[in-house]
Amino acid sequence: MFMSYEPGDVAEGFELKNANESIGGEMVTLDSVLTKSGAVVLFECNHCPYVVASVDRINRAAEKANQLGMGFVSINSNDPEKYKDDDFSNMKKRAEKGMPYAYLHDDTQEIAHKWGAERTPEFYLLDGQGKVVYRGRLDNSPRDPTMATTSELVDAMDSLSMGEDPVVTRTQSIGCSIKWK
């Protein structure tokens, strides 16, 4: 039976291999990313068109998290045997193009199952104690930024940084399904 972290749940730690060693080193833990201000944990991959179309916005969200004193990390849980674009060597190639956060490989898919992640991109915002305060999408138009009329993740980050609870704590992620083994 698989778990699923929802707002109010405290996330368990993880330690995963990092494809972006310029940020975080070879192995990265949740504890090393989580700051007293919180952290964003993103499930993403290389090939999903929703992720590809959101890269600039994801990078801006990571930079904003940094400005707010929050950590930011992403996890690729797709099956690398069925989806070669998402294997570790291709993760490293993507990270080398410029990525302002650690990019972790969940090759066993244990973390995606534990967290209940279903899509890429899918975001979890944690407070400084590791409690999920927001889960869901970046905004309501991952394929076309000009059509976005919401910014739930960034709004939740702003609320958390001001010591407030996010107004919206849960949205449905819009993207590709995680490619399970």
Locations of regions flagged by a protein language model:
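Chalcogenol-based redox active-site neighborhoods
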Residues: M1-R170, S177-K181
